[in-house]
Amino acid sequence: MVNHVDRNTTLCVSLAARPSNHGVRFHNWLYAELGLNFFYKAIAPTNIEQAVAGIRGLDIRGAGVSMPYKAAVIPLIDHVDPSAARIQAVNTIVNDGGVLTGYNTDYSAISELLASHSVDTDLRVAVRGSGGMAKAVVAAITDYGMGGTVVARNAETGVELAEQYGWAYSPEFPTDAQMLVNVTPLGMAGTDEKVQSFSDEEIGRADV
């Protein structure tokens, strides 16, 4: 963790309606491991326009962005990277000398992961979940040339996500899935592991 903060410390923040300590602990631990004089602070903004203006005004180096602000920050920043433009959702803002650029690192990470492992585009995919990260994952998989099924208990968001990218929707796990991606809040407090995880049988039938 951070041992001290001084006038040379570079500040990064997260903007979230309900900030948690998970990201704070991880970022500050990683800064310490890398020997960086950075400090990460979670913030629940009362006014998102003023919060984004504060990134510029206070020379904050970057910001993580969570719901419900991922779309709201887009008109407030200077540039939107293709990763964020694709799904109209920003999860990271980088401040370069007062110029704010928005990225979606979920989309970028999945895209790079698929390409670096040369994943077979013929594999049928099952994505469990239909929230904000699921949208980034489904978009990245679609752009890679793959398709499949959105598996979600919430029929409204599940159907909407599936239709947007030309996927199937099912509340139940499809038997033909060869690649599994779990983007539920599995592992977080209050989640149901039995409902949100893939079964041993489902994992056993899959290739990836």
Task: Give the role of each language-model region.
Residues 63, 125, 180-181:
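Receiver (REC) domain switch-region micro-motif
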Residues 163-207:
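Rossmann-like adenosine-cofactor binding region
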Residues 2-117:
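Phosphate/diphosphate ligand-binding glycine-rich loop within oxidoreductases
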Residues 143-165:
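NAD(P)-binding Rossmann-fold cofactor-contacting core
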